[in-house]
Amino acid sequence: MIDIHSHIVFDVDDGPKSREESKALLAESYRQGVRTIVSTSHRRKGMFETPEEKIAENFLQVREIAKEVASDLVIAYGAEIYYTPDVLDKLEKKRIPTLNDSRYALIEFSMNTPYRDIHSALSKILMLGITPVIAHIERYDALENNEKRVRELIDMGCYTQVNSSHVLKPKLFGERYKFMKKRAQYFLEQDLVHVIASDMHNLDGRPPHMAEAYDLVTQKYGEAKAQELFIDNPRKIVMDQLI
């Protein structure tokens, strides 16, 4: 599998705090069958403002750590970019990275961002010649159970990503993210999802869940669909090919 949304670089955002935590995440991801991981540390004004130099420096250390985990584990560079207007200039001047230096950029919004703002932001990114991959579309209230809006964004030229944790079956009691799982299921049923990725941060609260999600998608939608969402489409993104 290929995971295009992950927080594996230590001490740069709300992901791993140490080299050891980074290594544990990589090892668990590899155990689940992931062989390529795009590191997408947060870039968010006012919240995650770690200098690019430090992110890049720690990323290179994580790439070395990956060699200790497995010789065939590939780590690529990227970013999860929270949209604010200044992002456009940074993307245009290549001050923040796309996914593995491709045409694709992983873009996120707040849960309560109005649809018109999402639409406007993505339009501006597309005008730069960059293709947005909308991170965890199940989070956004403006897209909830709204095939028309998601289809409109796809028709504009955007792609969509759902978190593997939200593909899992809801727990009977105390399920905090049940509504997101319902949204993810709706998007999958409507065939509005291009990629499933982990958005892993740590092994305690936010582990990969890739193997379990792959099995569930296979059971519900077939092996070909699972391969498309976990392998084929992510590979095209990493290799800068059209989906």
UniProtKB/Swiss-Prot annotation:
Please list the cofactors this protein needs: Mn(2+)
GO-annotated molecular function: manganese ion binding; protein tyrosine phosphatase activity
Q: Which UniProt keywords apply?
A: Capsule biogenesis/degradation, Exopolysaccharide synthesis, Hydrolase, Manganese, Protein phosphatase
Reaction equations catalysed: O-phospho-L-tyrosyl-[protein] + H2O = L-tyrosyl-[protein] + phosphate
According to UniProt, this protein's pathway is: Capsule biogenesis; capsule polysaccharide biosynthesis
* GO biological process per UniProt: capsule polysaccharide biosynthetic process
The EC number(s) this enzyme carries: 3.1.3.48
User: Is Manganese set as a keyword in this record?
Assistant: yes
Q: What class of enzyme is it?
A: hydrolase
UniProt xrefs under PANTHER family: TYROSINE-PROTEIN PHOSPHATASE YWQE
Tell me the protein family, please.
Answer: Belongs to the metallo-dependent hydrolases superfamily. CpsB/CapC family.
Output this protein's name. Answer: Tyrosine-protein phosphatase CpsB
* The species this protein was found in: Streptococcus pneumoniae serotype 4 (strain ATCC BAA-334 / TIGR4)
